[in-house]
Amino acid sequence: MRSGVIAQKVGMTRVYNDAGEHIPVTVLRLDNVQVVAQRTEDKNGYTAVQLGAGQSKVKNTTKALRGHFAAANVEPKAKLVEFRVSPENLIDIGATLTANHFQSGQLVDVTGTTIGKGFAGAMKRHNFGGGRASHGNSVSHRAHGSTGNNQDPGRVWKGKRMAGHMGQTRVTTQNLEVVSTDEDRGLILVKGAVPGSKGSWIIVRDAVKSAAK
């Protein structure tokens, strides 16, 4: 099990393959990703590496974190993420991870925080069909309808799909293909859409499930 990387979502574009077909891709940028700390079985009870990405001003960094970064001899980072790894895949503190950490054609799992949509109704949030446009409908065109029975069960079931806050949740999209990488510019091009807004932090890992054949 290898470490993943921390990236920033730049946006979407398209590239063309050898057959002239266009492929929609999301551009992810690696911004000075370095190993800040290690976790070992002897000391911590598990094996992991802590990565830092981006750059943070010293005045905006807490005193405790300043000491943490100084011990690793790295500049203060804007984002810290820990990745579980197998003991043979531990990376030295201070090492820099680049875009060639991934190879073209491999599958990755991408984690991000979806764009918040605020308070949304059941039709937008859960794709409900809504009520009838006319013929007996009284101000219930977009209502979610009944939420439960009468005496039994006498309550609303947990998990009942209703109106509420939509988006702003942590989502992992699995088995996205790496179309290409650019080590010089620190770019990874991933096929398809990735959760999150432009500029948001994204976590990219090796895929844990093989794609369905």
From Swiss-Prot:
UniProt xrefs under SUPFAM superfamilies: Translation proteins
InterPro entries (UniProt xref): Ribosomal_uL3, Ribosomal_uL3_bac/org-type, Ribosomal_uL3_CS, Transl_B-barrel_sf
Reported modifications of this chain: Methylated by PrmB.
Protein name: Large ribosomal subunit protein uL3
HAMAP family: Ribosomal_uL3_B
Record family assignment: Belongs to the universal ribosomal protein uL3 family.
Region described as Disordered: spans on this chain: 131-155
GO molecular function annotations of the record: rRNA binding; structural constituent of ribosome
GO BP term, example: translation
Biased composition, class Polar residues, residue ranges: 135-152
Gene3D superfamilies given in the database record: 3.30.160.810, Translation factors
UniProt-listed Pfam families: Ribosomal_L3
Source taxon at top rank: Bacteria
Keyword Hydrolase found: no
Subunit structure and binding partners: Part of the 50S ribosomal subunit. Forms a cluster with proteins L14 and L19.
Described function: One of the primary rRNA binding proteins, it binds directly near the 3'-end of the 23S rRNA, where it nucleates assembly of the 50S subunit.
Gene Ontology CC: cytosolic large ribosomal subunit
Modified residues (N5-methylglutamine): 151
Keywords: Methylation, Ribonucleoprotein, Ribosomal protein, RNA-binding, rRNA-binding
